[in-house]
């Protein structure tokens, strides 16, 4: 029996049409909501969902590229408490996100990539992954409070 996968798993990714045994499809996949029968109407609705998903992904990528053009060359400056070149604590992803928010960029702290824990004053290369295909390189400048 051919089924359309509604959830990713061992059989394939979402939207794949796969052949499985009739009993497996009727007794497990379809009742659990993991798959639906591959009928003509279901195939047409799948194609419509794929087209709408592609349109949404294209819009998200365009928004990420727009953010990349605005963030290009932005240096994030943080003033932290420090003594003898060492920071009291560490600079976190949240600190960088707050600094970017003050500059007018709404970013998700989970998408900020820092190569290592920042515990010293200096300049660091960081990046922001706005989209799986769009990574924005930035500079992080950490200096001591006066």
UniProtKB/Swiss-Prot annotation:
GO cellular component: ribonucleoprotein complex; ribosome
Pfam families recorded: Ribosomal_L9_C, Ribosomal_L9_N
UniProt keyword annotations, A-Z: Ribonucleoprotein, Ribosomal protein, RNA-binding, rRNA-binding
One GO process term, biological-process aspect: translation
UniProt-recorded Gene Ontology molecular function terms: rRNA binding; structural constituent of ribosome
InterPro entries the record matches: Ribosomal_bL9, Ribosomal_bL9/RNase_H1_N, Ribosomal_bL9_bac/chp, Ribosomal_bL9_C, Ribosomal_bL9_C_sf, Ribosomal_bL9_N, Ribosomal_bL9_N_sf
SUPFAM superfamilies according to UniProt: L9 N-domain-like, Ribosomal protein L9 C-domain
HAMAP family linked: Ribosomal_bL9
Function: Binds to the 23S rRNA.
Family: Belongs to the bacterial ribosomal protein bL9 family.
Protein name according to UniProt: Large ribosomal subunit protein bL9
């Amino acid at each position: 029996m051919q089924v359309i996968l509604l959830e990713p798993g061992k059989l394939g990714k979402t939207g794949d049409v796969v052949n499985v045994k009739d009993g497996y499809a009727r007794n497990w996949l379809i009742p659990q909501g993991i798959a639906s029968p591959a009928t003509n109407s279901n195939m047409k609705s799948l194609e419509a969902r794929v087209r709408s998903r592609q349109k949404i992904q294209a819009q998200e990528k365009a928004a990420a590229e727009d953010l990349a053009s605005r963030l290009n060359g932005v240096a994030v400056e943080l003033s932290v408490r420090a003594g003898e070149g060492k920071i009291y604590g560490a600079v976190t992803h949240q600190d960088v996100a707050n600094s970017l928010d003050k500059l007018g960029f709404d970013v998700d702290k989970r998408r900020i990539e820092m190569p290592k824990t920042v515990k010293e004053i200096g300049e660091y290369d960081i990046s922001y992954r706005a989209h799986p295909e769009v990574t924005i390189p930035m500079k992080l400048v950490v200096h001591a409070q006066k």
